[in-house]
Regions:
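CBM-like carbohydrate-recognition segments
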Residues: 9-10, 23-67, 75, 79-95, ...
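Helix-capping and short linker residues that terminate individual alpha-solenoid repeat units
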Residues: 47, 81, 97-101, 126, ...
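Extended ligand-binding clefts on enzyme/binding-domain cores
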Residues: 154-155, 165-277, 284-295, 307-341, ...
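Asp-box/WD-like beta-propeller blade repeats and closely related beta-sheet repeat scaffolds
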Residues: 129-164
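Surface loop/turn signatures of beta-propeller and other carbohydrate-active proteins
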Residues: 33, 37-41, 148-149, 207, ...
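Bacterial Sec-dependent N-terminal signal peptides
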Residues: 1-24
């Protein structure tokens, strides 16, 4: 009986220690250490920023996956400036002549994504307008043509929407904000018949293929984690740029708040989110990219006073601590990253040791999350 009591006591102590570790807000030093470790691993492995990727076919290094990475790197640079970070980003943009994969006439948001990093680099030292010339030409083309139906998959909202917001702020011209809303509103309310956003669940179908009657194996709608993470991050990045009196600011905030509530409800017990937000049986398990994007958005919302800190700080603390504990390897490799795709079954397997087909965007998402976690008071 005495042995059973001691064993039970030890179990309770260990359980308490685990819960406490999950919910203890990390220090800035700890957050920075994790970000530096993950980024240093990537920069060492991919030291040649000019190298093409050869997954299925040859792609240049300014595609969306790398653009997302540089968004994260430059966010890290803002909280921990290092010359090698800046040089790694600047030299990459310079190598590509500050251009996009398919030139200035592309309407493909995946091509536009690199423009976010180009603009961020330009804003750090606005002495060379060539850095933003090409991406501005492409955005002006969107603004000056009537089409609004380019963002037919929700990833596109993150890849391109913040660029229009950045130019609206930079030039003080409403036309960028207006076009941004028109394209967002079409994706939200019209594409696929009734739009890609389901206001009942406050989550998004990835593209028209997943609109009803499509269902997950458990009968629920298919809400892909990373896809919803892209929209959630985009809303944060847009709200960061637009003025308080922008016509549709309250609409964006309403969607951001609704998504936040929905995401809170489907967080896993261990702190991560599943690849499928409403069907944990469909390739369920820890997944780092969606989790990182949700942490980024919620941390940003807390930092800006849009989200209640008391309610949401425990959510993101649990998620961040879980990623650092379970996904970050001692050498900085980032595990549980789902490979490229459009739904839960793609990019599998997702494990501690699995290497995604592209390693860059997962690191970028993690750095975005860490950079906002660092700013928490």
């Amino acid at each position: 009986m005495k042995k059973i009591t001691v064993t039970l006591l030890l179990t309770l102590i260990c359980s308490f220690a685990y819960v406490q570790a999950q919910t203890t807000q990390p220090s800035q030093r700890e957050i920075l250490r994790a970000c530096i470790k993950v980024n240093d691993y990537f920069m060492e492995k991919y030291a040649d920023y000019t190298a093409t990727s050869n997954v299925g076919r040859v792609r240049p290094s300014n595609i969306w996956t790398r653009g997302v990475y540089y968004e994260g790197l430059l966010a890290l640079h803002t909280i921990f400036p290092r010359e090698d970070y800046y040089k790694y980003a600047y030299d990459w943009g310079s190598f590509h002549k500050w251009g996009m994969r398919n030139g200035n006439t592309t309407r493909n948001a995946d091509d536009h994504c690199c423009g976010q990093a180009y603009i961020d680099l330009y804003n750090m030292c606005p002495s060379n307008p060539e850095m933003i010339r090409n991406i501005k030409i492409s955005m002006d083309m969107l603004v000056n043509t009537p089409q609004v139906n380019d963002w037919t998959w929700i990833d596109a909202i993150q890849m391109a929407m913040p660029i229009l917001a950045k130019f609206g702020k930079m030039y003080g011209e409403q036309k960028y904000y207006d076009k941004m809303w028109d394209m967002y509103e079409y994706s939200r309310n019209t594409h696929g018949g009734k739009g890609l956003y389901n206001p009942e669940d406050a989550l998004w179908w990835r593209d028209a293929d997943f609109c009803p009657p499509y269902k997950e194996p458990n009968g629920e709608d298919c809400y892909w984690s990373r896809g919803n993470g892209w929209v959630y991050a985009a809303l944060a990045r847009v709200l960061q740029e637009i003025p308080a009196d922008e016509t549709h600011r309250n609409d964006y905030i309403a969607d951001f708040l609704a998504m936040t509530k929905a995401l809170k409800a489907c967080q896993r017990e261990d702190g991560f989110w599943n690849a499928s937000l409403h069907d944990p049986t469909n390739f369920g398990g820890k997944e780092t990219t969606g989790t990182s994007l949700f942490v980024y958005g919620m941390a940003w919302g807390i930092n800006k006073g849009i989200l209640n800190k008391e309610e949401y700080l425990p959510i993101i603390t649990k998620a961040w601590n879980a990623m650092v504990k379970d996904a970050v390897h001692p050498n900085g490799f980032l595990g549980y990253v789902q490979g490229t795709g459009k739904e839960p079954k793609d990019g599998q397997p997702v494990t501690y040791t699995s290497v995604a087909d592209f390693e860059d965007y997962g690191v970028g998402c993690f750095l975005l999350a860490g950079s906002e976690m660092y700013k928490l008071k």
